[in-house]
């Protein structure tokens, strides 16, 4: 979790309004990873929503204000990289890709698609 903590420090210092609640959406289809991330960020004081799909993320974003998205690349309903590009075309919300893909090319493509950062699993 150290990599995510470093990213969160950057967002808190540069982009988050400290007077507003910080809403993080975790888009992850693996239940253990969902639970681990949700527990960690809830304990840190963030409001957390969890979904396993791109469709679920869109629904959350239509109904709630979102400050940051933690997005898995391999989702059951769509490619997380393409979802990143679509989100970036419509929004300035922070996007951190959280994935098991550790290849340098995947990282480059993720950032080119509009992600703000790229963190590999397993998370420590």
PLM feature spans:
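N-terminal/domain-start alpha-helical segments
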Residues: 11-124
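Intrinsic-disorder-associated, low-complexity terminal segments enriched in Asp/Asn/His/Tyr and depleted
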Residues: 7-9
């Amino acid at each position: 979790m150290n990599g995510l903590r470093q990213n969160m420090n950057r967002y808190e210092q540069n982009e988050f309004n400290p007077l507003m609640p910080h809403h993080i959406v975790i888009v992850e289809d693996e239940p253990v990873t969902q639970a681990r991330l949700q527990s960690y960020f809830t304990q840190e004081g963030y409001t957390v929503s969890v979904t396993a799909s791109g469709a679920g993320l869109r629904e959350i974003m239509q109904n709630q204000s979102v400050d940051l998205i933690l997005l898995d690349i391999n989702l059951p309903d769509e490619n997380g990289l393409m979802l990143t590009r679509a989100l970036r075309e419509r929004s300035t919300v922070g996007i951190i890709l959280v994935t098991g893909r550790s290849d340098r090319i995947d990282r480059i493509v993720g950032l080119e698609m509009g992600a703000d950062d790229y963190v590999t699993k397993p998370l420590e």
